[in-house]
Amino acid sequence: MANIKSAKKRIKVIETKTLRNKMLKSSLKTTIKNFLTVVEGKNVEEAKAAYKTAARALDMSVSKGIVHKNKAARTKSRLAAKLNALNA
């Protein structure tokens, strides 16, 4: 356990940020799963809206430092491929 006052504060701050990051990561995964279930339902219009939501969530998580930009780009690419396969 830390003895220095600033170290104790850092521990509290890190716990808070960890909880926030877990919450945001969880909601991101839920958004992606929602898109995948809509794609399974083969509804093109709903899938487009769900893709837009998922892509926006990925971009937001990159800007907040929760997901690496390359991982977000790769995930968006895979989701877009599924959307395009649904359109074809």
Swiss-Prot record:
Disulfide bonds: none annotated. InterPro entries: Ribosomal_bS20, Ribosomal_bS20_sf. The keyword RNA-binding applies. GO terms for biological process: translation. GO terms for molecular function: small ribosomal subunit rRNA binding; structural constituent of ribosome. Pfam families: Ribosomal_S20p (PF01649). HAMAP family: Ribosomal_bS20 (MF_00500). PANTHER family: 30S RIBOSOMAL PROTEIN S20, SMALL RIBOSOMAL SUBUNIT PROTEIN BS20C. This is Small ribosomal subunit protein bS20. It comes from Clostridium botulinum (strain Hall / ATCC 3502 / NCTC 13319 / Type A). The gene is rpsT.
